[in-house]
Amino acid sequence: HGIGRIKKYDIYSEQLPDSFDGFRIAFASDFHYESRFGKKRLPGLLKALQAADADLLLLGGDYRGRNGGNLSELFDVLYQVCVPYGTYGVMGNHENNANYEIVRQEMERTGIRLLEHQVDTLWKGNQYILLCGIRNPFDLTKNGISPTLSLQAEDYVIMLTHTPDYVEDVDVSNTDLALAGHTHGGQISFFGRYTPAHFSKYGSRFLSGLKYNSAGIPVIITNGIGTSRKDIRLFTPSEIVLVIL
């Protein structure tokens, strides 16, 4: 038992430089390690990430579960994934207080680049795409101005944000594709209540899959990793997303 599925999206954009045609991005989010996703499923995670054969690995936040858990075990596995363009991550709402520093240190230890309202450039020959990571997307007072606003419309820009709400809450102009998690695909709670509204103020609009904000910008929302069908998942398999540009 590892990951329920690898969900593949082929994304076309006229903005994409020719040399990035076929570029493969693996995206994993919402691990909640040792809360819903434990040590025995780590080999399955590694196998799925390696099978994705990605050029770039992106992490969408919520690494540690409520029960704690030794995050070094999770990050050791992420470190083993071979991706030519490296691994980048953002923080989720569970990375608060002490958790934030624990995750930051694990990222530093394993060479994962944390993007907090920052943009990095990925080069292929003399062409490039831009990767933008959003710092705490729930705090719009501090983080309500998207870093993409200072970029050029002709650039190809990928945004990594923990919650999909961010692409609707604020102006994310110049973004060509956003990747988000947080919703868990609208899992059923222990009490049998549907919980999508708990995860997104927009109800089921940004629940799972490929959606669009009001400006027509595509956002892919993953169900996440830290779930198991025998625990509290119903019809929402855990997944890794594979985006092919």
What spans do the regions from the language model cover?
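N-terminal membrane-anchoring alpha-helices
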Residues: 1-16
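Beta-strand-turn-beta hairpins that frame and shape the catalytic cleft
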Residues: 13-26, 112-113, 120-133, 152-155, ...
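Membrane-embedded segments
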Residues: 19-113
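Active-site metal-binding loops of divalent metal-dependent hydrolases
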Residues: 28-33, 61-63, 93-94, 118-119, ...
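Conserved beta-sheet core of the metallophosphoesterase superfamily
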Residues: 164-241
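Short beta-strand-to-coil "C-cap" segments at the C-terminal boundary of structured domains/repeats
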Residues: 243-245
